[in-house]
A protein has these predicted regions:
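Gram-negative bacterial Sec-dependent N-terminal signal peptides
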Residues: 1-24
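A residue-level marker of the well-folded mature domains of exported/periplasmic proteins
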Residues: 2, 22-171
Length: 171
């Protein structure tokens, strides 16, 4: 939960730092995740909601039903950008597919904070993520040790389009 809170605080901080204060304007910050169903995303949502309540920020937590719906995530992202939020938190299902939408956000002056999975772009102000290459490498070392350094091992990666999946594969 610490990393979830960190992502939320960084995202909300970026929104507060880079938005223009307006009297009686509510601070609105959409958080667009990769999905809802996995326990991980439920923890991210809970952390984001707790941080938003603590900081007096209104958030939405949205994402596609499954982590295979890249087009749906793009639609959600475009709808959020159209509401002209003070900032945007985003976990990309595909490291390249949403770059045009993120460019629209950047052009509109909406600060972007990427989390969990980055994009192949410098549009986000920052990306908060695990070093998946090193984490997967450490796991592979432990597995090799457990099997005595010999034998065959299969790696099944959850996807080949997100920075998370690619990093875990390459580690």
């Amino acid at each position: 939960m610490k990393s979830t809170t960190l992502v939320s605080v960084l995202a909300l901080g970026a929104a507060a730092t880079f938005s223009t204060p307006t009297f009686a304007q509510e601070t609105y910050f959409p958080i667009i995740a990769k999905g809802f169903s996995h326990q991980f995303w439920q923890a991210v949502k809970a952390g984001a909601e707790a941080s938003a309540a603590k900081n007096g920020v209104t958030i939405t937590f949205e994402g596609p039903n499954t982590e295979a719906e890249i087009d749906k995530q793009t639609d959600i992202l475009n709808a959020a950008i159209a509401k002209n939020p003070q900032g945007l938190g985003f976990a990309a299902l595909d490291s390249q597919a949403q770059i045009p939408a993120l460019q629209k956000a950047a052009d509109a002056g909406i600060p972007i904070v990427a989390f969990d999975s980055g994009v192949d772009s410098d549009l986000p102000l920052t990306t908060c993520t695990t070093d998946n290459v090193n984490a997967a490498g450490a796991a592979a070392d432990k597995l090799a040790e457990a099997i005595g350094g010999e034998g065959e091992v299969a790696a099944e990666i959850h996807d080949q389009t997100s920075a998370t999946g690619i990093g875990r594969r390459d580690g």
